[in-house]
């Protein structure tokens, strides 16, 4: 059955159900039923009483509907009176991954690290390893993933600043961040999404850039993304919050007056009140710990309007593993030469 024809059946079922529904919802049990895991508790076809959604292959009716969010509908072909049917799955487009064809809503594991599902011609995958959920703490500004013999998932280890300078790559206390305006659960990509963390800002003060590499695009090709970033202002701006006496570090500072971002010869259209990382008096440096990305409109010469991704600081961390200005960005450029950028 095609999705269009199935939709017509669903509308017809709802019309029949409306003819058999009571005028008042006063016969529901006092306690709602207990449903099996992954089975939703929904209202019956009359919109009165809570019932457990029927699953694929189970009997169904207007009072016991199927779980529609799983692509199920009640098939009444065997009952001309349309009173009792069977939950069936809507047909959808199949998926092809690594030469293997998967049916709509079929789940599979392309590797031990990912669990994927075919959703009407598109493949959506979720990681099975919890590296991004159990991140190192603020005392580990230079985390590195290592393979463990005999195990599928990698583990975090903390390197010192000296070890990273020899031949490694550090993110300088950066952590995975949320991108404002972008749906991270988008399943329109027919490949396993891979995205590195954002690099440290190329400037310790003033406007700089940070970058990451991702394949989240229509062609699933690895591309470098660049965003503007400002860890702190190079000049002491009026309106800073004054730190308390006796404190050696101020992790986060915020202006009381809105400011405009400046990029080359362009200025942000709207003023903002961003958070900046503070300073320490005991030799430690403060770098972003949790960030987001938002798109900011800039007005350029000839009144040209452009949008640029800009880092938004949520929290900062103070530590002794201080990154050198621009060094981490130069290391990343050496690791991914020739990649297209978005800035």
UniProtKB/Swiss-Prot annotation:
One GO BP annotation of this record: signal transduction
Per the database entry, which stretches of residues form a coiled coil? none
* S-S bridge residues: 21-46, 25-48, 28-49, 35-52, 60-74, 66-87, 249-286, 266-300, 277-316, 280-318, 285-322
Residues of the IGFBP N-terminal domain: 19-90
Has UniProt tagged this entry with the keyword Ubl conjugation?
A: no
Q: Which Pfam families match?
A: Cys_knot (PF00007), IGFBP (PF00219), TSP1_CCN (PF19035), VWC (PF00093)
**The TSP type-1 domain covers which part of the protein?**
190-235
Glycosylation (residues): 265
Q: Where is the signal peptide?
A: 1-18
Tell me the protein family, please.
Belongs to the CCN family.
What's this chain's function?
Immediate-early protein playing a role in various cellular processes including proliferation, adhesion, migration, differentiation and survival. Acts by binding to integrins or membrane receptors such as NOTCH1.
UniProt name for this protein: CCN family member 3
**Organism, per UniProt?**
Xenopus laevis (African clawed frog)
Q: What is the lineage of its organism?
A: Eukaryota, Metazoa, Chordata, Craniata, Vertebrata
Gene expressing this chain: ccn3
């Amino acid at each position: 059955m095609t999705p269009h024809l199935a939709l017509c059946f669903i509308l017809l079922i709802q019309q029949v159900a409306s003819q058999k529904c009571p005028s008042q919802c006063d016969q529901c049990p006092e306690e709602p039923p207990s449903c099996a895991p992954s089975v939703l508790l929904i209202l019956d076809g009359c919109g009165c009483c809570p019932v457990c959604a029927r699953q694929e292959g189970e009997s169904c009716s207007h009072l016991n509907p199927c779980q529609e969010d799983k692509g199920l509908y009640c098939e009444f072909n065997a009952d001309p009176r349309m009173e009792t049917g069977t939950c069936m799955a809507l047909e959808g487009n199949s998926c092809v991954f690594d030469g293997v064809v998967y049916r709509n809503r079929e789940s599979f594991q392309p590797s031990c690290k990912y669990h994927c599902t075919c959703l009407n011609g598109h493949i959506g995958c979720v990681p099975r390893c919890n590296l991004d959920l159990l991140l190192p703490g603020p005392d580990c500004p230079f985390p590195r993933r290592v393979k463990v013999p005999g195990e599928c998932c990698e583990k975090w280890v903390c390197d010192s600043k000296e070890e990273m300078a020899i031949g490694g790559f550090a993110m300088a206390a950066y952590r995975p961040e949320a991108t404002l305006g972008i749906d991270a659960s988008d399943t329109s990509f027919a490949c396993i999404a891979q995205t590195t963390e954002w690099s440290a800002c190329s400037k310790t003060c003033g406007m700089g850039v940070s970058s990451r590499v991702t394949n989240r695009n229509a062609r699933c090709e690895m591309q470098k993304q660049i965003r503007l970033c400002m860890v702190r202002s190079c000049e002491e701006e009026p309106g800073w919050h004054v730190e308390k006496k006796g404190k050696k570090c101020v992790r986060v500072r915020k202006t009381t007056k809105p400011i405009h971002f400046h990029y080359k010869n362009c200025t942000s259209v709207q003023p903002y009140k961003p958070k900046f990382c503070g300073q320490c008096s005991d030799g430690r440096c403060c770098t972003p710990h949790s960030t987001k990305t938002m798109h900011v409109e800039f007005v350029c010469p000839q009144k040209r309007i452009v949008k640029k991704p800009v880092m938004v600081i949520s929290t900062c961390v103070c530590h002794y593993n201080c990154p050198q200005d621009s060094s981490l960005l130069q290391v990343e450029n050496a690791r991914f030469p020739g990649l297209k950028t978005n800035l």
